[in-house]
């Protein structure tokens, strides 16, 4: 497979994730030096989902975060564009509801969910605003969104160190543990091309979300973005 480019057909990107599905979680643990689990836990804490609430876990991968939500009594639907990820998730947790779906054309009715979360997947949605608009559509008025995504460390020396890690160590580590190391060339490219914290906040506003805010994790390597759908919003608002 050729080196991943950011303007690739979305189905090609999904195919790359199909290829890495079986060892996806292990690879994430290794490449993040174990931080991936902490970032996902922080995301769920920020979401604050309560037992009985209906939550959409978008770009759910193999369902790692969905499983934690379900174990806490949340009615969670796991949705991913990669059929390989969905199949692997069903194999691991057959009790969870997995759905294959495109974030820009979600297969759910307006106002279906109390909350939506997407972890490390918004970079893969093209265009991102269309995906955020769809997330708004399927969220009930007054509902909330939490996005965890790679971001830009605000302290320049740390940003330089992080960039050195991405360029020097990411691919060799991926080759050691991943079933498709070239997919992690795409990871590096997509991180470098992705907007910073304020840029993502602007995308959220453009899509119709309100109460937008963020906080940095691990020095800004990751940012947690939070937003709400205003209670008086028409459920059709925000369509892309």
Curated annotation (Swiss-Prot):
GO BP, sorted A to Z: menaquinone biosynthetic process; methylation
Enzyme Commission number(s) of this protein: 2.1.1.163
Gene Ontology molecular function: demethylmenaquinone methyltransferase activity
InterPro entries (alphabetical): SAM-dependent_MTases_sf, UbiE/COQ5_MeTrFase, UbiE/COQ5_MeTrFase_CS
Keywords annotated in UniProt: Menaquinone biosynthesis, Methyltransferase, S-adenosyl-L-methionine, Transferase
Gene3D superfamilies attached to this UniProt entry: Vaccinia Virus protein VP39
Binding-site residues, S-adenosyl-L-methionine: 62, 80, 102-103, 119
CDD domains reported in the protein's UniProt record: AdoMet_MTases
Pathway it works in: Quinol/quinone metabolism; menaquinone biosynthesis; menaquinol from 1,4-dihydroxy-2-naphthoate: step 2/2
Catalytic activity: a 2-demethylmenaquinol + S-adenosyl-L-methionine = a menaquinol + S-adenosyl-L-homocysteine + H(+)
Pfam family, one: Ubie_methyltran
HAMAP family: MenG_UbiE_methyltr
Family according to the record: Belongs to the class I-like SAM-binding methyltransferase superfamily. MenG/UbiE family.
Function: Methyltransferase required for the conversion of demethylmenaquinol (DMKH2) to menaquinol (MKH2).
Protein name, entry field: Demethylmenaquinone methyltransferase
UniProt organism field: Beutenbergia cavernae (strain ATCC BAA-8 / DSM 12333 / CCUG 43141 / JCM 11478 / NBRC 16432 / NCIMB 13614 / HKI 0122)
Gene name linked to the record: menG
């Amino acid at each position: 497979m050729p080196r991943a480019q950011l303007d690739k057909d979305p189905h090609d990107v999904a195919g790359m994730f199909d290829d890495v599905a079986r060892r996806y979680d292990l690879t994430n643990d290794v490449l993040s030096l174990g931080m991936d689990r902490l970032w996902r836990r922080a995301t769920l804490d920020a979401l604050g989902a309560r037992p009985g609430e209906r939550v959409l876990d978008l770009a759910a991968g193999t369902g790692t975060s969905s499983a934690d939500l379900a174990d806490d009594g949340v009615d969670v639907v796991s949705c991913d564009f990669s059929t390989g990820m969905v199949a692997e998730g069903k194999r691991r947790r057959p009790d969870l509801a997995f759905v294959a779906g495109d974030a820009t054309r979600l297969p759910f009715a307006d106002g279906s969910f109390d909350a939506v979360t997407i972890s490390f997947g918004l970079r893969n949605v093209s265009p991102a605003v269309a995906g955020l608009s769809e997330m708004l559509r399927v969220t009930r008025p007054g509902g909330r969104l939490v996005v965890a995504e790679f971001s830009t460390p605000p302290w320049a020396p740390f940003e330089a160190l992080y960039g050195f890690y991405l360029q020097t160590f990411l691919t060799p580590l991926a080759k050691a543990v991943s079933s498709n190391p070239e997919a992690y060339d795409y990871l590096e490219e997509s991180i470098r091309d992705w907007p910073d914290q304020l840029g993502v906040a602007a995308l959220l506003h453009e899509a119709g979300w309100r109460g937008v805010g963020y906080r940095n994790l691990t020095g800004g390597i990751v940012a947690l973005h939070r937003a709400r759908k205003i209670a008086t919003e028409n459920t059709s608002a925000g369509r892309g």
